[in-house]
């Protein structure tokens, strides 16, 4: 069954709301990509509104980490997810979202991109 992002058919009181118009394709949604740390890199290309393409990153073990002190950006290996404010269960499953703290070869880094929307993991190195 499709994910529908339209208004609910019920009011807060429980009364049924009758539709003024039918459901439209523009109101459909998709499940989240939930990018995981894995040895294999897996991307999914999805057609979105306006016949545009969106690259969803499903699995990866690399991130582009920017070192602010040296002004250098490097492609490094991600080992695991240390903290994720989006969902506490994402830490155990190694799911990367924007704002997640990841462990890399260079040290701890904070994800600044949206991997499920952008198709790449960009991060900033944290100073300890």
UniProtKB/Swiss-Prot annotation:
<dbReference type="GO" id="GO:0005840">
    <property type="term" value="C:ribosome"/>
</dbReference>
<dbReference type="InterPro" id="IPR022309">
    <property type="entry name" value="Ribosomal_Se8/biogenesis_NSA2"/>
</dbReference>
<dbReference type="GO" id="GO:1990904">
    <property type="term" value="C:ribonucleoprotein complex"/>
</dbReference>
<comment type="subunit">
    <text>Part of the 30S ribosomal subunit.</text>
</comment>
<dbReference type="GO" id="GO:0003735">
    <property type="term" value="F:structural constituent of ribosome"/>
</dbReference>
<dbReference type="InterPro" id="IPR018283">
    <property type="entry name" value="Ribosomal_eS8_CS"/>
</dbReference>
<dbReference type="InterPro" id="IPR020919">
    <property type="entry name" value="Ribosomal_protein_eS8_arc"/>
</dbReference>
<dbReference type="Pfam" id="PF01201">
    <property type="entry name" value="Ribosomal_S8e"/>
</dbReference>
<protein>
    <recommendedName>
        <fullName>Small ribosomal subunit protein eS8</fullName>
    </recommendedName>
</protein>
<dbReference type="InterPro" id="IPR001047">
    <property type="entry name" value="Ribosomal_eS8"/>
</dbReference>
<keyword id="KW-0687">Ribonucleoprotein</keyword>
<comment type="similarity">
    <text>Belongs to the eukaryotic ribosomal protein eS8 family.</text>
</comment>
<keyword id="KW-0689">Ribosomal protein</keyword>
<dbReference type="GO" id="GO:0006412">
    <property type="term" value="P:translation"/>
</dbReference>
